[in-house]
Swiss-Prot record:
Domain called UBC core: residue spans: 15-165
Organism: Dictyostelium discoideum
Entry's transmembrane regions: none
Cell inner membrane recorded as keyword: no
Membership in a protein family: Belongs to the ubiquitin-conjugating enzyme family.
One GO term (biological process): protein polyubiquitination
Domain of life: Eukaryota
Protein role: Catalyzes the covalent attachment of ubiquitin to other proteins.
GO MF annotation, one: ubiquitin conjugating enzyme activity
Protein name: Ubiquitin-conjugating enzyme E2 J2-like
GO CC annotations on file: endoplasmic reticulum; nucleus
Length: 170
């Protein structure tokens, strides 16, 4: 995912590393309902998440994989948010335009955490607001994509390596 990280020439600051490690420890102790997340083993600035489609939504049963790409000076700058799995809500492998993403650094608050970013993404996924990186589809189309999501994810090497318990055949 390094092609999405314009700060690849800048190593993360000490404050950035400390903050990201602390946030991962916090998420590990207090998991977010319907969301799994892990940093890349080789790059603390690259986190991978999975949103589990909530019951009674068009996403029910879906497994949606994506990335958070943090800037070297996080939390002073917001991360990029990308979705890999087709959901019918977001374009795949495009930066999402959210107030909690690098699309809107002017609205970013360093007090926001990875947990709040992921909760915001989950909330936005359930909303119908149209913005850069979002797409408009019917609920039926979203349901069809939900049923195909694991087959799609199983073709992604990084997904299978980081979330092997999800990628295993039942």
């Amino acid at each position: 995912m390094s092609e999405h990280n314009s700060d690849i020439v800048h190593p993360p600051t000490k404050d950035c590393i400390t903050r990201l490690k602390r946030e991962f420890q916090e998420i590990s102790k207090n998991p977010i309902e319907n969301i799994l997340v892990t940093p890349s083993p080789s790059n603390i600035l690259e986190w991978h998440y999975v949103i589990l489609g909530a019951s009674n939504t068009p996403y029910e049963g879906g497994v949606y994989y994506g990335q958070l790409i943090f800037k070297y000076n996080y939390p002073l700058s917001p991360p990029s948010i990308l979705m890999t799995t087709p959901s019918g809500r977001f374009e795949t492998q495009k930066r999402l335009c959210l107030s909690i993403s690098d699309y809107h650094p002017e609205s970013w608050s360093p007090s926001w955490s990875t947990s709040s970013i992921l909760l915001g993404l989950l909330s936005f996924m359930s909303d119908n607001e149209v913005t850069a990186g979002s797409i408009v589809t019917t609920n039926d189309e979203k349901r069809i994509l939900a049923t195909k999501s694991m087959d799609f994810n199983k073709k992604n090497k990084t997904f299978c390596e980081l979330f092997p318990y999800l990628a295993m055949d039942e």
